[in-house]
Protein backbone atom coordinates (compact mmCIF):
# COMPACT_ATOMS: atom_id res chain seq x y z
CA UNK A 1 0.00 0.00 0.00
CA UNK A 2 2.80 2.43 0.87
CA UNK A 3 4.52 1.62 -2.42
CA UNK A 4 1.40 2.60 -4.37
CA UNK A 5 1.27 5.96 -2.59
CA UNK A 6 4.94 6.61 -3.34
CA UNK A 7 4.55 5.69 -7.02
CA UNK A 8 1.43 7.83 -7.34
CA UNK A 9 3.17 10.78 -5.67
CA UNK A 10 6.13 10.51 -8.05
CA UNK A 11 3.83 10.34 -11.09
CA UNK A 12 1.89 13.42 -9.96
CA UNK A 13 5.13 15.31 -9.34
CA UNK A 14 6.50 14.41 -12.78
CA UNK A 15 3.26 15.49 -14.47
CA UNK A 16 3.40 18.80 -12.62
CA UNK A 17 7.00 19.42 -13.73
CA UNK A 18 6.18 18.48 -17.33
CA UNK A 19 3.25 20.91 -17.32
CA UNK A 20 5.47 23.77 -16.12
CA UNK A 21 8.06 23.08 -18.83
CA UNK A 22 5.39 22.88 -21.53
CA UNK A 23 3.85 26.17 -20.40
CA UNK A 24 7.23 27.92 -20.57
CA UNK A 25 8.03 26.44 -23.98
CA UNK A 26 4.63 27.40 -25.34
CA UNK A 27 5.09 31.15 -24.86
CA UNK A 28 5.09 33.10 -28.14
CA UNK A 29 8.17 34.70 -29.62
CA UNK A 30 8.25 38.26 -30.95
CA UNK A 31 10.62 40.06 -33.30
CA UNK A 32 11.44 43.77 -33.10
CA UNK A 33 13.80 46.31 -34.63
CA UNK A 34 14.89 49.39 -32.71
CA UNK A 35 17.67 52.00 -32.86
CA UNK A 36 20.97 50.74 -31.48
CA UNK A 37 22.03 52.30 -28.17
CA UNK A 38 25.16 54.47 -27.93
CA UNK A 39 27.67 55.67 -30.51
CA UNK A 40 29.52 52.40 -31.17
CA UNK A 41 27.07 49.66 -30.20
CA UNK A 42 27.92 45.96 -30.18
CA UNK A 43 25.75 42.87 -30.47
CA UNK A 44 25.94 42.54 -26.68
CA UNK A 45 24.63 46.11 -26.30
CA UNK A 46 21.67 45.16 -28.50
CA UNK A 47 21.00 42.05 -26.42
CA UNK A 48 21.07 44.04 -23.16
CA UNK A 49 18.84 46.78 -24.60
CA UNK A 50 16.37 44.17 -25.88
CA UNK A 51 16.26 42.44 -22.50
CA UNK A 52 15.70 45.73 -20.68
CA UNK A 53 13.00 46.97 -23.07
CA UNK A 54 11.02 43.81 -23.74
CA UNK A 55 11.71 41.09 -21.12
CA UNK A 56 12.05 43.07 -17.88
CA UNK A 57 15.81 42.55 -17.92
CA UNK A 58 15.73 38.75 -18.35
CA UNK A 59 18.65 38.06 -20.70
CA UNK A 60 17.82 34.35 -21.07
CA UNK A 61 14.55 35.22 -22.86
CA UNK A 62 16.44 36.99 -25.66
CA UNK A 63 16.77 34.32 -28.37
CA UNK A 64 18.51 36.33 -31.11
CA UNK A 65 20.15 39.75 -31.01
CA UNK A 66 21.83 41.24 -34.10
CA UNK A 67 23.36 44.59 -34.90
CA UNK A 68 22.38 45.70 -38.40
CA UNK A 69 23.93 49.06 -39.21
CA UNK A 70 22.58 51.49 -36.65
CA UNK A 71 19.65 49.28 -35.68
CA UNK A 72 19.20 46.26 -33.45
CA UNK A 73 17.15 43.22 -34.45
CA UNK A 74 15.84 41.20 -31.54
CA UNK A 75 13.83 38.00 -31.23
CA UNK A 76 12.62 37.26 -27.72
CA UNK A 77 10.20 35.12 -25.74
CA UNK A 78 7.35 36.99 -24.09
CA UNK A 79 7.02 37.05 -20.31
Swiss-Prot record:
Q: Which family does it belong to?
A: Belongs to the scoloptoxin-15 family.
Q: For this UniProt entry, which residues form the secretion signal?
A: 1-25
Keyword Disulfide bond present in the record's keywords: the answer is yes
Where would you find this protein in the cell? Secreted
Q: Name one GO cellular component term.
A: extracellular region
- Recorded protein name is U-scoloptoxin(15)-Sm1a
Q: Name one GO molecular function term.
A: toxin activity
Amino acid sequence: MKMNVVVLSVVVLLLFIANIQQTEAGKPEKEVNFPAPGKKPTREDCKKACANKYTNGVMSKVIVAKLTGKNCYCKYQEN
